[in-house]
């Protein structure tokens, strides 16, 4: 038995390893095939040729179902020394006029989530030319040319010493979702969905109880 899993190549998603570890313990004959995926582009399925996806704010269209397994505050990512970085937290309004990242061929619907277009009521000012990938994005932020946003849990895993994260006191939540095809009756996929649902419920209960490590 084999299960192919797409995941965001540009986020530090190792925190979800225990979920798949338990799946393998419950399904000892199962092997996992991993598909790192780049930033979403127009016309590309979030899953590609994978059977399931573990994705941050996926663009789930017709023929796909999803389950939210985590919800995290959004934070702003900026260069060390940026005037706003002296604060422990800022408001969304503080960054709406900043220049944001742009990525080559990025699906504008996904980009609008991270540039907070719904709060601004208009598209953001974007860096030009667009960057090619996650490493180039971090270099652009570290240079002071742009700012970005990310889930709070991802901020400590950004591999560049020239960037810092600042909490957004009124920022949106960012969802991590398990995604699968609606017509997929593979029992392994269904087992993963059930396990992920139980995992998400347990994490929420622990967070509500204030237990350490539940976030």
Q: What kind of feature is each model-predicted range?
A:
Residues 18-22, 26, 40-78, 142, ...:
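Short beta-strand-centered segments that line the small-molecule binding cleft or hinge
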Residues 14-18, 166-208, 212:
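A late-sequence structural motif
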Residues 1-36, 44, 116-119:
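Short alpha-helix C-terminal cap/hinge motif
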Residues 1-6, 62-65, 86-89, 118, ...:
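Short helix-loop hinge/linker segments at domain boundaries
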Residues 66-74, 78-100:
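Flexible hinge/capping segments at coil-to-helix
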Residues 29-30, 61-67, 72, 139-184:
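Beta-alpha-beta core module
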Residues 16, 85-88, 97-122, 186, ...:
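Secondary-structure junction motif
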Residues 38-43, 104-164:
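Hydrophobic hinge/microswitch elements
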């Amino acid at each position: 038995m084999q299960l192919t899993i797409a995941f965001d190549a540009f986020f530090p998603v190792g925190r979800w390893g225990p979920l798949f570890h338990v799946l393998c313990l419950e399904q000892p004959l199962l092997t996992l095939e991993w598909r790192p995926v780049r930033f979403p582009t127009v016309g590309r399925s979030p899953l590609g040729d994978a059977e399931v996806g573990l994705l941050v704010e996926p663009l789930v269209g017709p023929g796909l179902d999803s389950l939210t397994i985590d919800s995290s505050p959004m934070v702003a990512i900026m260069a060390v020394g940026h005037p706003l970085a002296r604060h422990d937290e800022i408001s969304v309004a503080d960054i709406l006029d900043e220049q944001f990242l742009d990525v080559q061929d990025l699906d504008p619907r996904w980009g609008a989530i991270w540039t907070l277009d719904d709060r601004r009521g208009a598209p953001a000012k974007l860096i030009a030319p667009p960057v090619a990938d996650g490493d180039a994005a971090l270099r652009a932020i570290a240079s002071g040319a742009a700012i970005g946003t990310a889930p709070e849990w991802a901020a400590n895993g950004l591999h560049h010493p020239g960037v810092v994260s600042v909490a957004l006191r009124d920022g949106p939540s960012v969802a991590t979702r398990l995604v699968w095809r609606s017509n997929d009756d593979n029992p392994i996929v269904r087992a993963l969905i059930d396990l992920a649902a139980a995992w998400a419920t347990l994490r929420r209960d622990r967070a509500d109880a204030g237990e350490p490590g539940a976030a």
